[in-house]
Design a protein with these regions (language model features):
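Short, low-complexity disordered leader/linker segments with a strong preference
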Residues: 1-32, 413-419
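Beta-alpha junction/loop-to-helix N-cap segments that form part of ligand/metal-binding clefts
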Residues: 32, 45-52, 65-137, 145, ...
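Solvent-exposed, acidic/polar segments of extracytosolic/periplasmic ligand-binding ectodomains
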Residues: 31, 350-419
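Short, charged, surface-exposed loops that flank catalytic or proteolytic processing sites
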Residues: 335-347
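Signal peptide-proximal N-terminal region
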Residues: 26-28, 52-74, 165-169, 196-199
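Extracytoplasmic ligand/sensor domains, especially the bilobed periplasmic-binding protein
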Residues: 99-205, 254-281
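Extracytoplasmic "Venus flytrap"
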Residues: 31-55, 77-84, 106-107, 177-186, ...
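Extracellular/periplasmic periplasmic-binding protein-like sensory domains
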Residues: 147, 246-324, 335, 390-393, ...
Length: 419
């Protein structure tokens, strides 16, 4: 029988050692990780979820004694969802705040303006959900937390058109609708490429201004073209406006969706309710058994426990696991190299895989993932606006890829909507 006094003593020693390492870390200058984030403006509904994920990582690492024996500290500013604010923020982070590491806010349109600043200061920069942001620069110290693989633009719309091509009869025509902004331009480019590849004729192809609030004229114009499928690349706020307009006006088409940003977040689905039914869209992660990578559900539990008080998306299935994984990568790279030298960290990140709550990740040319892993989903049976119906996958089916598939597409769009 074990000596209970000895066991208690050992436990006390373990606690004291952990406390001692935390205190020792606090006595040293913090390692500063700097970024901008959409805390206000149209992208805040997603951006603030990323900030909570960053905070959870920061607290966990500091509780373990920090990095290199030093505490970590997040240094961030609200970019107000405005790309014009980004360069000034990153210049301040580097020149005034003297941050050690740079990460980004959410999305291509807010990441791209920061890259020239990082390049001019020769700093490592980690982009969060930025589609092919480095394709113009080929900057060796840029890394992407977005699972679209080494050819992200080519991959982005591929699954949507692959699904369409398998239907019987296959749709013959497509309308492409996109916001006039960098991410959506790339998504539309991908859609055009795969329309050609699958022999589907483009009968409508227009971009609308980012400040559009009335989408009725766009939906009427699309309907006039009579496309058998519609591919949309939009901002999160636009996604709500577009789908509400479709719900009010009606749209006769066999397949609808593609690149509706924000629809992956519970907060957006809660706004839309049944208007999301039938949509086939790109997604990145769902809590299905095949995607429960080690540690991810523990993180989700922590996130969801704090989400109500933080006033953010209640489920956190979209951006948060990837935001947390991004910092896991930096944590592992710093721990392995025992340095904050951005050049040495970049070399290590290009040559080693990383274990994260989003699975194993490795980086190739331009800092993109070596393996593409987007998923394609369809929403269905959504009733009302209660969040509980989105907590497990009962209102979403993973259609592709095969390794994550949970069911088949309901086709055409009218059938999926129960019409």
């Amino acid at each position: 029988m074990k000596n209970p006094t000895r066991a208690v003593s050992a436990a006390i020693v373990a606690v004291m050692l952990l406390w001692g390492s935390a205190v020792a870390a606090e006595d040293k200058a913090p390692i500063k990780i700097g970024f901008s984030m959409e805390l206000t403006g149209p992208f805040a509904v997603v951006g603030k979820t990323g900030l909570l994920a960053f905070k959870i990582w920061e607290e966990e690492v500091n509780a373990k004694g920090g990095l290199l024996g030093r505490p970590v500290k997040l240094v961030y500013y609200d970019d107000q969802s405005n790309p014009a604010n980004v360069p000034g923020i990153y210049t301040k982070l580097i020149d005034i705040d003297k941050v050690d590491l740079l990460i980004s806010s959410y999305g291509t349109n807010l990441v791209a303006p920061a890259i020239p600043v990082a390049i001019s200061h020769d700093r490592l920069f980690f982009g969060l959900f930025a589609l092919a942001a480095n394709e113009k620069f080929h900057y060796p110290k840029y890394f992407s937390m977005l699972p679209f693989g080494p050819e992200p633009v080519k991959t982005f719309a591929a699954g949507y058109f692959d699904l369409a091509a398998k239907q019987n009869p296959k749709p013959k025509t497509v309308a492409i609708v996109a916001t006039d902004a960098e991410f959506q331009h790339k998504a539309a480019e991908s859609a055009r490429e795969h329309a050609r590849r699958t022999g589907i004729k483009v009968v409508y192809d227009r971009a609308y201004p980012p400040n559009t609030v009335d989408f009725s004229p766009i939906i009427h114009a699309v309907q006039a073209a009579q496309p058998e499928m519609v591919y949309i690349a939009s901002y999160p706020s636009d996604t709500v406006g577009i789908l509400r307009a479709i719900g009010e006006i009606g749209l006769s088409t066999k397949m609808l969706g593609g690149g509706l940003a924000g629809l992956q977040a519970a907060a957006i689905k809660m706004q839309l309710g049944a208007a999301a039914n039938g949509i086939v869209n790109v997604d990145l992660w769902e809590p299905v058994p095949t995607m429960r990578f080690p540690g991810v559900m523990d993180f989700i539990k922590k996130y969801q426990a704090r989400a109500p008080a933080e006033g953010v998306d209640l489920l956190g299935y979209f951006l948060p696991p990837f935001a947390y994984s991004e910092l896991q990568v930096l944590e592992q790279a710093v721990a392995a190299t025992k340095t904050l030298d951005n050049g040495k960290l970049a070399e290590y990140m290009h040559s080693h895989p990383f274990q994260t709550i989003e699975g194993n990740i490795a980086f190739g040319p331009d800092g993109e993932w070596t393996e593409a892993r987007p998923i394609w989903v369809q929403y269905h049976d959504i009733k009302g606006h209660d969040v509980e119906q989105f907590r497990d996958p009962k209102t979403v089916t993973i259609l592709a890829p095969e390794k994550y598939k949970t069911g088949d597409v309901i086709y055409p769009y009218s059938k999926a909507r129960g019409e």
